[in-house]
C-alpha cells in the first residue's frame, strides 16, 4: 500500500501581512493563504496585535487543508518584539504587544538601568523595539500585568503554546535587539534579574524542536517551537554550503546580516546590533525600514502607473531624496520638502525612490564593512531597478539573487529537516553602468553629513 503524502505548514507573521504556507515535503509551495494583522487594546489604552483572532483564522484554514491533505509538521515564524503575557490559569493577559506603540515613554529612566552596549550589542530603540523597554513600561504603567504573569512568551512561542500547550522560549527571538541577552557571556543579561522575570521566561528550546501535537480533523500535526522571522531567512542560506556572505533580507525591514563584521565595529546610534542565529551563533546586523519607506514615498509622491524608471544624469543633478521616512535606522526623520519632486513624471519619481532606498542600503553595507558576496532575498529581488543600481555601486562584490524568493516563510521550512543542507540556485545581478551612481551617492552622502542627518545616540 502506497504511503500517503504528508504536507507541512508554515505560519509566517509579518508586521503587516500574514501568510499560511502549505508545503510539500520537499518544501515546494502547494498553496498560500493570506491575511493582515488586526489590532485590539488592553484596557482601551495599549494597542496590541490581535493574535487570538489570527489563531482563529489559521485554525479554520488548517481544518480546510486537512480535509484534502495529510499534515505532518507546523512551525511559526514571526517578526520581533511582540510578547504575550500568560497568567496562572493559562489565560492571556496580553496577546500580543505591538512594537509601534509608544513603549518608550520612560526611555530616559530605562536607559539608566541598561547593561552596556558591549554586552547586549543592542541600541536603545524607539517605541517597543526593545523587549526590555516594553517590560519597563508595563512595570510603571500597568504593574498588575507583571504581577499576574506566570509566563512571558515571544510571538512564535505564543502560537506554538496555543497549539501544543507547551511553554517555550527560543534563542533567535530572545536575542533579537531585546536587551534580554548578554552576547559576551551567552546568558540572560543583568536586566532580567532587575525586572525579576527570570522564572517567567520558559525553558529555551531549539527552534526545530517538536514540543507537542494537535489534532486537526483527527489528523495529528506536530508543532515545532518556532523562530524569529529574519533569522529564518538567514537560516536558509546559512544551512547551505555557502561559507562567507552578506545577506540582505527585505520586507517592511531591510536587514543586513554579515558574520564577518566584528562586534566591536557595531555602532548603537546607527541601528547596528547583534542577532543570534538558531544555532546560538552571534550575527552582526544592521537595519532600516526600507519597505516601509518605499511604500511611504510611493504614497507621498502619488506614484501610479509605473512602466519603467526614468533616471538620467540631468534628473540626478537636480533632485535627490534624503532620509528618512520611517522610524529606526541610521538616519534622522526627514524634513525635506518633496513639492518639487511631486511635479515630476511617475517614472522619474519612481526612479528617485529606487535610488534613495538603494543609497541607504549602500551606506549600510559600507558601515558593515561588507566585502564578501551579497545575497538578496525578499521583495527587493523583484525590483530590477534597485538591484542593478546596487550592483553598480558595489562593483568590487558579486551580488546574487536566488532563483526563487525565499523570504521568512520558506526559510522557516528548513526547520522541518534541519540536518539537510540546501542547494542554492543563485543568479548574478549585472550592474547598470549607464550612469556613474557612485558619483551621485557621494553628492548625496556629503549632503547628509552637511545636514547632520546621521543619528546621534538615542536616550
Regions found by a protein language model. Give the residues of each.
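N-terminal glycine/serine-rich phosphate-binding loop of ATP-dependent small-molecule kinases
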Residues: 1-95, 148, 203, 219-225, ...
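Active-site core segments that coordinate phosphate-bearing ligands/cofactors
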Residues: 2, 19, 111-124, 130-150, ...
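Short, acidic/turn-prone active-site loops that include or flank metal/cofactor-
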Residues: 34-40, 97-104, 252-254, 403-407
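Active-site phosphate-binding/coordination module
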Residues: 68-131
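Nucleotide/phosphate-binding loop and acidic/charged catalytic motifs
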Residues: 74, 169-175
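Glycine-rich phosphate-binding loop of ATP-grasp-fold ATP-dependent ligases
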Residues: 93, 173-180
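A conserved helix-loop-beta module that forms one wall/lid of the active-site cleft
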Residues: 193-209
Amino acid at each position: 500500500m502506497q504511503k500517503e503524502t504528508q504536507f507541512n505548514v508554515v505560519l509566517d507573521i509579518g508586521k503587516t501581512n500574514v501568510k499560511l504556507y502549505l508545503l510539500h515535503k520537499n518544501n515546494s509551495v502547494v498553496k498560500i493563504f493570506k491575511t493582515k494583522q488586526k489590532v485590539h487594546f488592553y484596557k482601551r489604552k495599549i494597542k496590541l496585535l490581535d493574535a487570538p483572532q489570527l489563531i482563529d483564522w489559521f485554525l479554520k484554514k488548517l481544518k480546510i487543508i486537512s480535509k484534502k491533505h495529510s499534515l505532518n509538521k507546523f512551525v511559526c515564524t514571526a517578526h520581533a518584539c511582540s510578547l504575550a503575557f500568560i497568567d496562572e490559569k493559562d489565560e492571556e493577559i496580553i496577546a500580543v504587544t505591538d512594537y509601534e506603540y509608544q513603549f518608550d515613554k520612560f526611555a530616559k529612566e530605562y536607559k539608566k538601568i541598561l547593561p552596556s552596549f558591549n554586552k547586549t550589542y543592542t541600541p536603545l530603540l524607539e517605541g517597543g523595539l526593545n523587549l526590555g523597554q516594553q517590560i519597563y513600561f508595563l512595570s510603571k504603567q500597568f504593574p498588575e500585568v507583571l504581577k499576574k504573569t506566570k509566563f512571558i512568551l515571544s510571538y512564535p512561542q505564543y502560537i506554538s503554546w496555543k497549539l501544543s500547550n507547551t511553554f517555550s522560549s527560543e534563542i533567535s527571538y530572545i536575542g533579537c535587539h531585546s536587551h534580554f541577552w548578554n552576547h559576551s557571556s551567552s546568558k540572560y543579561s543583568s536586566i532580567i534579574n532587575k525586572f525579576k522575570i527570570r522564572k517567567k521566561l520558559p525553558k529555551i528550546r531549539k527552534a526545530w524542536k517538536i514540543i507537542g501535537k494537535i489534532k486537526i480533523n483527527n489528523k495529528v500535526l506536530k508543532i515545532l517551537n518556532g523562530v524569529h522571522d529574519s533569522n529564518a531567512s538567514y537560516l536558509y542560506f546559512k544551512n547551505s554550503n555557502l561559507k562567507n556572505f552578506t545577506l540582505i533580507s527585505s520586507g517592511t525591514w531591510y536587514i543586513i546580516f554579515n558574520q564577518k563584521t566584528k562586534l566591536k565595529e557595531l555602532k548603537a546610534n546607527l541601528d547596528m546590533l547583534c542577532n543570534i542565529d538558531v544555532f546560538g551563533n552571534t550575527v552582526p546586523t544592521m537595519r532600516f525600514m526600507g519597505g516601509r519607506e518605499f511604500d511611504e514615498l510611493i504614497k507621498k509622491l502619488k506614484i501610479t502607473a509605473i512602466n519603467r524608471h526614468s533616471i538620467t544624469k540631468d534628473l540626478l543633478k537636480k533632485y535627490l531624496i534624503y532620509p528618512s521616512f520611517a522610524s529606526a535606522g541610521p538616519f534622522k526623520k526627514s524634513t525635506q520638502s518633496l513639492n518639487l519632486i511631486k511635479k515630476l513624471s511617475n517614472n522619474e519619481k519612481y526612479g528617485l525612490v529606487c535610488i534613495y532606498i538603494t543609497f541607504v542600503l549602500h551606506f549600510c553595507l559600507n558601515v558593515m564593512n561588507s566585502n564578501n558576496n551579497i545575497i538578496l532575498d525578499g521583495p527587493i529581488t523583484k525590483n530590477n531597478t534597485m538591484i542593478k543600481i546596487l550592483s553598480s555601486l558595489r562593483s568590487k562584490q558579486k551580488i546574487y539573487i536566488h532563483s526563487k524568493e525565499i523570504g521568512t516563510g520558506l526559510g522557516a521550512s528548513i526547520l522541518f529537516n534541519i540536518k539537510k543542507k540546501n542547494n542554492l540556485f543563485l543568479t548574478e545581478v549585472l550592474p547598470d553602468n549607464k550612469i556613474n551612481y557612485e558619483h551621485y551617492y557621494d553628492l548625496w552622502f556629503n549632503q547628509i553629513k552637511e545636514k547632520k542627518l546621521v543619528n546621534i545616540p538615542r536616550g
